């Protein structure tokens, strides 16, 4: 509830477009600065960097949980992931409060909320990040995965198409997430409508074929062909 109230209040803050730094990477900080000397922007960067360190730990535990077969170890890894996602969310929210124009922080507010199952709150944060930095690839990909979780298939497909034109690597990541979603829906007792799942599966296969056929046209594909 506090998260929703915080996001709702921050949406009212006027947005000034911000320049994009490396996605997900820690931000550089002034040397020899103390918390008393730091500007709100520097304090925001510090909170953001702390959040990045925490979210990376969460991701490692989350990835580990998918590989574990022992029930107790899996449960422990998931609990650790949850706790680190919650901790990092607090830090990213603090960063966004100190610097409402930091789209990187808003993107991670969305990411951590999505990992915690707060999909509607996550979407609001992604929208904030994209309002500050239109076309921001990381937010488009993360938002696409949130659309999947909410069964908003056409929105997830559009997110993929937007990424396909701008960032093939993240487009591939979203397509992989779609494949995982399809598998999970087919194995779930109360999954989505079978016709809709089959239609998405066909679409994913078609898009994967197109991606493979055009891989050499991208900068990364051209570089790979010369190795």
Per-range role (PLM):
Residues 24-35, 165-227:
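Terminal, low-structured helical/coil segments at or just beyond the last alpha-helical repeat
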Residues 56, 115, 149-150, 184:
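Register position in tetratricopeptide repeats
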Residues 108, 142, 176-177:
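Canonical tetratricopeptide repeat
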Residues 77-90, 115-128, 151-159:
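Structural signature of tandem alpha-helical TPR/SEL1-like repeats
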């Amino acid at each position: 509830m506090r998260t929703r109230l915080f996001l709702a209040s921050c949406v009212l803050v006027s947005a000034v477009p911000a320049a994009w730094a490396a996605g997900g990477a820690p931000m550089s900080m002034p040397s020899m600065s103390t918390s008393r000397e730091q500007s709100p922007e520097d304090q925001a960067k510090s909170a953001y960097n702390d959040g990045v360190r925490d979210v990376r730990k969460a991701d490692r535990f989350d990835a580990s949980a998918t590989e574990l077969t022992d029930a107790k170890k899996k449960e422990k890894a998931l609990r650790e992931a949850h706790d680190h996602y919650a901790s990092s969310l607090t830090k990213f929210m603090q960063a966004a409060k100190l610097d409402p124009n930091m789209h990187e922080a808003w993107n991670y507010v969305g990411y951590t909320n999505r990992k915690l199952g707060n999909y509607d709150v996550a979407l609001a944060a992604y929208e904030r990040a994209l309002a500050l930095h239109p076309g921001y690839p990381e937010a488009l990909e993360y938002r696409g995965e949130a659309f999947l979780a909410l069964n908003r298939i056409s929105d997830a497909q559009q997110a993929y198409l937007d990424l396909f034109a701008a960032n093939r690597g993240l487009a591939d990541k979203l397509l992989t997430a779609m494949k995982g979603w399809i598998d999970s829906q087919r194995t779930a007792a109360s999954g989505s409508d079978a016709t809709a799942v089959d239609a998405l599966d066909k679409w994913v296969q078609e898009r994967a074929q197109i991606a493979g056929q055009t891989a050499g046209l991208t900068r990364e594909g051209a570089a790979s062909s010369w190795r």
